[in-house]
Amino acid sequence: MYNSACPEGRSVISRRRTGLGDCLWSLAAAWSYARHTRRSLVVDWSESCYSADPNINLFPVLFDNINDIGGVSVHYVSRTSSLALESSVIPAWWRLPVKQRGTRSDAQIFRERDELRNLFFSRRDADAAAVICDCCLMWCCDEDLEREFYDHLIVNQYVRQEVDRVYAERFLGNVVIGVHIRHGNGEDILDHDRYWCEENAAMNLVAHKIREERRKFPFRSTKIFLCTDSPAVSEWFRREMPGLFATEKEFRQRGEGELHSAHFGLGGAVAALVDMQLLSRCDVLIRYPPTSAFSRWPSLLVERVFDFDLARGVFCQADRKAGGASSG
């Protein structure tokens, strides 16, 4: 059984409603702070962009029963936004009575993000009983701790079975080059549009890198596993790249936006997690753009990861242990 009540005492509440990669990365940061300050962790993934039902907490839908992560007690609630919270809470906006909160402006969200980042990096404990994290907290967790956090997660049985099925059919006996291409399909998240000023040139850059990596395995069967949010990108690579495969998914129409949408229901979140897990099993991972949160978890597990450096115009091999990257 999941702990489904807000705990008494000190806690960190991670409330996210965005794409799965952002939800997980931000949750890892909240967990890290909870562990450092010996607080409990509360997960609120209700009102998710993947579901039309605001009461469904997405985390228990995707992951098996987890009541403890690395010594941190974990609890699950829904709709923190409608809870009357005690005065001992930060950021201060959450102290307002529910009827006065309304919708937070972007400026308010960015202020909260900066406040929480400063708190997390300072490694000091807050005086407040509850710390509410309702903003993007990417890059706010030590990478070794982040790996440890992901190691504790257990995806649900359906996802495990689907990943094992695709792995047996497509991965076994092959070198698999995973390619994650975040296009946006009409939306500009994290300023990704700047990577797509010349769309055909961008896709050719990725294709060139795929061929370059393929040549490194002259005596092995190689396959390309593609994850993208764009029907145009999918069509282009299926046409240009022999040996490419992808999981079956429905795209939104061109220009209508990304895949994390209530249009696809909870099945969209499940499909995203399947793709995420399969990327983690690849021998090589190519990311364009590299800042997408979706492929963050896989990028910490795959041995050879190549991220595109827009300033230099080349793919660089990630070298996170050394704190840098080399072109390759």
Swiss-Prot record:
Fucosyltransferase which adds the fucose moiety of the nod factor on its terminal reducing N-acetylglucosamine end. Uses GDP-fucose as the donor group. Its EC number is 2.4.1.-. GO terms for biological process: oligosaccharide biosynthetic process. It is an enzyme of class 2 (transferase). This is Nodulation protein Z. Belongs to the glycosyltransferase 23 family. Pfam families: NodZ. The lineage of its organism: Bacteria, Pseudomonadati, Pseudomonadota, Alphaproteobacteria, Hyphomicrobiales. Keywords: Glycosyltransferase, Nodulation, Transferase. It comes from the Bacteria. InterPro entries: GT23_dom, NodZ. GO terms for molecular function: hexosyltransferase activity. The gene is nodZ. Residues 6-317 form the GT23 domain.
